[in-house]
């Protein structure tokens, strides 16, 4: 019985470690963590370390499909990049990441690739309806 319990525990630990490794290796996760998590949180729940000082507070990013489609669309990418600003509220409160990424990455193509990785990552963490 003790051997069985040890085997079950070892299996559970291995499965948990594999799940964490898979989560860390999701394409775009590193980009999300670098550019988005300070405001939107590591879990994309809107509770990043600076969220409390921002007005309006950053939204959770785990239920975007209703607004941006399934899979997440070009519309979301253009919003993140700053290509499209929301008209109802004037300028976006979010940084214009397209400009930031172009300056940092050195080209429009490299910036676009980073944005698409982030959008694909966000698509992978959407809460199922």
Please report, for each region that a protein language model flagged, where it lies by residue.
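Positively charged n-region of N-terminal signal peptides that target proteins for export
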Residues: 1-4
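Bacterial N-terminal signal peptides
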Residues: 6-16
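Sec/Tat signal peptide C-region and signal peptidase I cleavage site
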Residues: 17-21
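Periplasmic/extracellular electron-transfer cofactor-ligation site
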Residues: 23-24, 29-56, 67, 82-92, ...
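Extracytoplasmic/secreted proteins, especially bacterial periplasmic and envelope-associated proteins
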Residues: 27, 31, 71, 75, ...
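Gly/Gly-Pro-rich "capping" loops immediately C-terminal to redox-active cysteine motifs
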Residues: 29, 45-77, 99-107
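Axial heme c-ligation environment in periplasmic c-type cytochrome domains
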Residues: 58-59, 81-113
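A mid-sequence interfacial segment
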Residues: 106-129
